Regions:
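Acidic/glycine-rich phosphate/pyrophosphate-binding loops and surrounding catalytic core
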Residues: 1-151, 155
């Protein structure tokens, strides 16, 4: 995108697949086009590739460290402005899964909701009663897990638990 934004006729040949592990010095692409456009876009393209490769690599390392197919490593909704889709794609390439794409695809019960509702279970029950299908409940104590699940939470987020 960086190169074609400056030279729509730029020829780009990708030499590796997305998510493919590569070593230092590996050529990732071959470009043919306007030299000024290439040099202008180079740093932005390299920085973006490095950033996304770092995400995919770190996620892959964490997934391997978990060494448990029953566990799923989820990302955060908190991404760099303008890079959400790319960062979430990098997470998937590394073997992780996306937690939420935005605020629209799941309700998240947090400590403020629990405080207003009076309990974790009641906060989840209210979301269920409102017709919410995907309910992620944040818990910070072990005794909150069962009530959250019994009330209908579809996922738990363990917050600051040692």
């Amino acid at each position: 995108a960086f190169f074609r934004a400056l030279d729509p006729a730029m020829e780009i040949e990708l030499l590796v697949e997305d998510g493919q592990a590569v070593g230092p010095g590996t050529d990732l692409m071959r470009l043919s086009g306007n030299a000024r456009a290439m040099l202008t876009a180079e740093r932005s393209a390299l920085n973006t590739v490095q950033h996304l490769s770092g995400i995919a690599t770190l996620v892959r390392d964490y997934v391997r460290a978990m060494d448990n197919p029953a566990c799923t490593l989820l990302d955060t909704r908190k991404t760099i402005p303008g890079l959400r889709l790319l960062e979430k794609y990098a997470v998937r390439l590394g073997g992780g899964s996306n937690h939420r794409m935005g605020l629209w695809d799941a309700a998240m019960i947090k400590d403020n909701h629990v405080l207003v509702a009076g309990s974790v279970g009641e906060a989840v029950r209210r979301a269920v009663a409102a017709g919410v299908k995907e309910i992620i409940c944040e818990v910070d104590r072990l005794d909150q897990i069962e009530p959250a699940l019994a009330a209908g939470a579809t996922r738990l987020l363990l917050d600051n638990m040692d």
